Amino acid sequence: MVRFFQRNDGVIVEAEIHGLPRTENGFFAFHIHEGDTCIGEGFPNTGGHLNPGREVHPKHAGDLPPLLSDHGSAYMKVFTDRFYIEEIIGKTVIIHSDPDDFQTQPSGNAGMKIACGVIQRL
């Protein structure tokens, strides 16, 4: 589950993820994408990283720190001032198979999309 908490100057992102594949280094790229659906194998309609300011990677609004998995589970809590909750409702949050290298354009060589969720207001 990924939850977002609006603050005056940005958003707290809290992720608690279970069932991640075991990998050698345990890092998984974690991004908000511009698309609005998780339908289809490999989630082909999630679009690119959320990037309304047309920044280069890793400065996209949707670029988040990587998840670090321990035996298939990861927990992360981070603050960002790159977006407000209203801007991400209906967008997708993606976990990739590989860590983000923070250099390769346009998406950090993050590998396949292995998990997807549509961001909704509760």
Predicted regions located by residue number:
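N-terminal leader/targeting pre-sequences
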Residues: 1-122
